[in-house]
């Protein structure tokens, strides 16, 4: 499954690998990879495999789930598709409460004590999805964990999830994608070495040499 999803992301160009022309993240980090999982929605086969994968992941890792929550906005469609396959209720969590109306941060019929799994499309540092999990906890839900399509596998994210005490699982990851890209001829051995070096220390620029 991990390799299949990685190949999907590479084929539809949801993931770009540019070891020699790095992208600049909002945080200022120079990165050899850019991931846009929103593109997966435009490809029915890919979208279906992701929905089935997330549903299976939740059944396997979080069998007690009673509600699926999507992070706004990228996690919403994937949460809806997975919830449909699992025949479970679904809600979504805004990054902050609305400035008008009822001022909701969580949209949907959420019941206190409900066991919830949060779906995110991409995990970089983990900040946004952990904020969503915190909002659900504050609303009285029991957050079982997080399911996502892809993770960069950065140490900072692992530390953040550990500190928050939140379990997380993904359909594929950075290492699997790098291996698939090399096997598929998307990158060279030299590129793969740069990608590995970047992951070890994303804030360093030594991998660019």
Curated annotation (Swiss-Prot):
Pfam families referenced in this protein's UniProt entry, alphabetically: Pribosyltran (PF00156)
KW Magnesium (keyword) present: yes
GO molecular function, one term: magnesium ion binding
PROSITE patterns for this protein: PUR_PYR_PR_TRANSFER
EC number: 2.4.2.10
Cofactor(s) this protein requires: Mg(2+)
Pathway(s) annotated for this protein in UniProt: Pyrimidine metabolism; UMP biosynthesis via de novo pathway; UMP from orotate: step 1/2
Coiled-coil blocks: none
Alphabetical UniProt keywords: Glycosyltransferase, Magnesium, Pyrimidine biosynthesis, Transferase
Superkingdom of this protein's organism: Bacteria
Reactions catalysed, as given in the entry: orotidine 5'-phosphate + diphosphate = orotate + 5-phospho-alpha-D-ribose 1-diphosphate
Enzyme class: transferase
Binding-site residues, orotate: 124
Physiological role: Catalyzes the transfer of a ribosyl phosphate group from 5-phosphoribose 1-diphosphate to orotate, leading to the formation of orotidine monophosphate (OMP).
NCBIfam families the UniProt entry points to: pyrE (TIGR00336)
Family: Belongs to the purine/pyrimidine phosphoribosyltransferase family. PyrE subfamily.
Name used for this protein in its record: Orotate phosphoribosyltransferase
């Amino acid at each position: 499954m991990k390799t299949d999803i990685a190949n999907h992301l590479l084929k539809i160009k949801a993931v770009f690998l540019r070891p020699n022309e790095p992208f600049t993240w909002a945080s200022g980090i120079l990165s050899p990879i850019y991931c846009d999982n929103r593109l997966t929605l435009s490809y029915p086969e890919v979208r279906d495999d992701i929905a089935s994968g997330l549903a299976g992941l939740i059944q396997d890792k979080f069998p007690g789930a009673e509600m699926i929550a999507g992070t706004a906005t990228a996690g919403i469609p994937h949460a809806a598709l997975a919830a449909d396959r699992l025949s479970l209720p679904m809600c979504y969590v805004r990054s902050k409460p609305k400035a008008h109306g009822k001022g909701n941060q969580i949209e949907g019929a959420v019941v206190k004590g409900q066991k919830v799994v949060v779906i995110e499309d991409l995990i970089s540092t983990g900040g946004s999805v952990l904020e969503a999990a915190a909002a659900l906890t504050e609303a009285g839900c029991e957050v079982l964990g997080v399911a996502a399509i892809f993770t960069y596998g950065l140490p900072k994210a692992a530390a953040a999830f550990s500190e928050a005490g939140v379990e997380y699982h993904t359909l594929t990851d950075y290492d699997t994608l790098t291996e698939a890209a090399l096997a598929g001829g998307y990158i060279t051995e030299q590129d793969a070495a740069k990608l590995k070096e970047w992951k070890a220390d994303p804030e360093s620029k030594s991998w660019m040499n």
